[in-house]
């Protein structure tokens, strides 16, 4: 492709609102153009990258036995009502009516649609298992779209769905699709980790995320320094502490702590280690009017996903209202604790072996020092309530945990009967008996993969594309292409020879200054660059450089095509 026939639109500066490197560089490189908050046009250069990702995905889906179809963007409300997600999904589901006042939505996922198709088309165990996928535009009405295509309202995803006669078949396909996702991200040149994860709004049982490692990632993953264990921090369990509880040394003492409402201010006011404090979180119980008290160390981070699964706790997790707290505790938030509270109390494992805690006294502006479980209040039930921290024992018992940030680019689920039961997706088994199908789903955020790859692969000059994702493999930058016959003839000849060799080449024949052409080639991140100028040609050379770190070097013009093709095939 010649640049004069293509469309290149680069910027020297990124918009002020762009926070992430990927957002800045995608705008500057002209990969995307914003149309509205969270809505983008994929420009020709960006679309080439998107198609490269899709091609790899299609190849690996076919290898895994998944068959492509294409489901609609606009979905009928009755399917979502049947599954129970019409109201549950909340405001992120964009609802609309047609001219006949019938309800529809812009689909953020396609579980309901594919379940409806399968129940109409498959009725016998002889037709199972089946694995379908599509690559389609999705819409999720994010309350605050940000970070460019990383968290946009409109995005492109690969969704695959499998249907089975039994769980063993589901597990086999789940494993195959897990492996397919690993191959996809490996082929795309990404540093990633598969991690055990929560099922979230999709539901089901078993679940793994695929996290691209990046400091800008919104997610935190925990992994063992010894074994293959890895999980999203939301799911990684903490283990009960070993050994005996420390002996109580202090008496329970009520201390006046005026205007002390946070752990930070408590630590400063009493000049104590934060590890000696307990913080109180009050949530609604399952029964009307019941409150549940949750206790964890002041330096630990509360995990609401774990808390929501506790017996007696209302789901979805709901924080107690200030009025309800005052009614049952006699104090406001910031001064709460278990002394005198008669409701259910859970305490985190990390508090079980400690003694002489500092905690709220259930009286505004007062705290207790020297608090001990069993002596000053009944023993709580000790459970896992917090996020893991670096140095915690790995849940598999092998090594210690480390933490890293990641960007979720894929997610696989064992949905089991979540949708097939609700929507009566059934088949006749070999005994002629009706059975509910087992179901799995397997997603990749195609547009997010592009942004995540840039987060991992950039420098001060611009993007550094991996081999599989680059919009072009080679860029030829001729100096004075319009004015120098010698340069133009050499550039055209090398361009033709590389095309004949099967390379994906961009000949930048724009009538621009040399600095613009060179800067754009680096900003766009094309892996291989050939610079052709009159001075080097007089010596029989061209300048060749790889975008990823290699210095430019002179290469004989007669050898450049072989040199580049060898690098492309390496």
Curated annotation (Swiss-Prot):
PROSITE patterns, from UniProt? AA_TRNA_LIGASE_II
EC main class here is ligase
Question: One Pfam match, by short name?
Answer: tRNA-synt_2b
A GO CC term attached to the entry: cytosol
Q: Where is this chain's protein located in or outside the cell? A: Cytoplasm
In the record, biological process GO terms are: prolyl-tRNA aminoacylation
Q: Which GO terms describe its molecular function?
A: aminoacyl-tRNA deacylase activity; ATP binding; proline-tRNA ligase activity
Gene3D superfamilies per the UniProt record, alphabetical: Anticodon-binding domain, Bira Bifunctional Protein, Domain 2, YbaK/aminoacyl-tRNA synthetase-associated domain
According to its UniProt record, which reaction does this protein catalyse?
tRNA(Pro) + L-proline + ATP = L-prolyl-tRNA(Pro) + AMP + diphosphate
What the entry says about domains is: Consists of three domains: the N-terminal catalytic domain, the editing domain and the C-terminal anticodon-binding domain.
> Which NCBIfam families does the UniProt entry name for this protein?
PRK09194.1, proS_fam_II
Q: Name the chain's protein.
A: Proline--tRNA ligase
What does the organism's lineage look like at the top?
Bacteria, Pseudomonadati, Pseudomonadota, Betaproteobacteria, Neisseriales
